């Protein structure tokens, strides 16, 4: 473990670089020994290996706008509060799938849009990472389901109206 940087009253304060024994590294601002302000945290060996978080910290946790890049190719750009994804943000998977919308406590929650590389798209409400509330799922061939969702599933049975554009709507099941 090694720290190179500024100290004040025996604490890390100001600019500095801390390297941990597992190869992790934080480069940025410190206040009273905690990550505070602008900085880049690169994780070392282990579960979070090679993940990188860039931007703002408060009390040692990601806060404000930030970017985190995961070793599996996923990337999140957006708001953090107390170390969790909170507010507006975009998560892009390595396969090109993308979510743009609201986050709460690290989960997709609120209004958002999820798109797939094949052209499929869900637009609507999310809760705890799942479709929940009013939403529209559009398939790449133009078919649509418009209706209510609960825990990632359609809440009601479907009916479809066949026209040039097939539209399926939720209706009360029997």
Roles of regions detected by a PLM:
Residues 2-13, 25-36, 48-63, 75-86, ...:
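Conserved anchor residues at repeat-unit boundaries in beta-strand-based tandem repeats, strongest
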């Amino acid at each position: 473990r090694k720290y190179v940087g500024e100290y004040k009253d025996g604490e890390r304060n100001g600019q500095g670089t801390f390297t941990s024994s597992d190869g992790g590294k934080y480069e940025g601002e410190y206040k009273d020994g905690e990550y505070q302000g602008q900085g880049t945290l690169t994780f070392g060996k282990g579960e979070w290996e090679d993940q990188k978080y860039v931007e703002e910290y408060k009390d040692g946790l990601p806060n404000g706008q930030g970017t985190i890049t995961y070793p599996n190719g996923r990337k999140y750009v957006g708001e953090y509060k107390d170390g969790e994804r909170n507010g507006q943000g975009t998560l892009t998977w390595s396969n090109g799938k993308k979510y743009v919308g609201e986050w709460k406590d690290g989960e997709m929650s609120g209004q958002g849009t999820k798109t797939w590389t094949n052209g499929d798209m869900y637009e609507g409400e999310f809760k705890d990472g799942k479709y929940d509330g009013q939403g529209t799922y559009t398939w790449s061939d133009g078919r649509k389901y418009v209706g209510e969702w609960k825990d990632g599933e359609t809440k009601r049975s479907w009916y479809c109206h066949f026209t040039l554009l097939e539209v399926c709507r939720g209706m009360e099941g029997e």
